[in-house]
A protein has these predicted regions:
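Short, acidic/turn-prone active-site loops that include or flank metal/cofactor-
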Residues: 37, 42-47, 61-65
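Conserved beta-strand positions in the central sheet of alpha/beta enzyme cores
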Residues: 19, 38-41, 58-59, 85, ...
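Glycine-rich, proline-tolerant flexible connector loops at the mouths of alpha/beta enzymes
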Residues: 1-14
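Extended hydrophobic secondary-structure segments
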Residues: 11-37
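Glycine-rich beta-to-alpha transition loops that act as phosphate-gripper elements at the mouths
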Residues: 18-26, 42-44, 119-125
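Short, structured coil segments at secondary-structure junctions
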Residues: 14, 34-35, 52-54, 145-146
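Hydrophobic/aromatic ligand-binding patch that stacks against planar heteroaromatic rings
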Residues: 30, 49, 139-141
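Catalytic alpha/beta core domains of metabolic enzymes, predominantly
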Residues: 54, 61-184
Length: 184
């Protein structure tokens, strides 16, 4: 994507906050130089680029079905002083959904003080169902496990209100957990 730097600059000029979702250093570097604040995603194959970016990165496993590479790469990022969030990658139903939730629990156990991100769009966009209850359940899981950032999208028609749904669900589950009440 040769014009990524230009596009990021245009968005930043209009006061948008920008992240870049690429594994390719030739896209990541110009996007960050133009003002992207967050890089999704780094793993063992491209982690060296994170050292000189000067921005936060999202660390993903080398293999989505496992947590391969996470421990080694957390050590590198911490040694380099690079801020990061860990995303064990949420899998769609039928492709390892339950196991992926287990990976989030394992990451929280291994890294109790680290920021974690969940790409909930992987479930809402890939499940042909009303997204509001799906978002509520995922935000409830995030609240209970201390996952403080989610990535959602509104591409497919059944998820076209996901951002608003997540904002409402976030408030509901936060209140429920903070006050020991049912989320209603």
């Amino acid at each position: 994507f040769e014009s990524i730097g230009e596009i990021v600059s245009l968005l930043r000029d209009k006061d948008f906050r920008v992240s870049v979702d690429s594994l390719n250093p030739r896209e990541i570097e110009p996007a960050v130089a133009a003002g992207a604040e967050l890089v999704l995603s780094v793993h063992s194959g491209n982690i060296d680029v994170a050292r000189s970016l000067g921005c936060e990165v999202v660390l993903i496993p080398d293999d989505n079905a496992t947590l391969a590479g996470i421990d080694e790469n957390v050590k590198k990022l911490e040694t380099w002083g690079v801020p990061y969030r860990i995303d064990p990658v949420l899998e769609p139903i039928g492709f390892g959904f339950a196991r992926s939730l287990g990976r989030y629990l394992e990451i929280r156990k291994r890294y109790p003080d680290s920021e974690i991100m969940m790409g909930i769009g992987n479930l809402t966009e890939l499940t042909d169902a009303d997204s509001a209850p799906v978002n509520l359940l995922l935000l409830g899981f995030c609240q209970e496990t201390g996952i403080r950032s989610v990535l959602t999208t509104e591409v497919i028609h059944w998820a076209s209100s996901s951002v608003r749904e997540c904002e409402l669900a976030r408030k509901l589950v936060h209140y429920a957990c903070a006050h020991g009440q049912l989320p209603k």
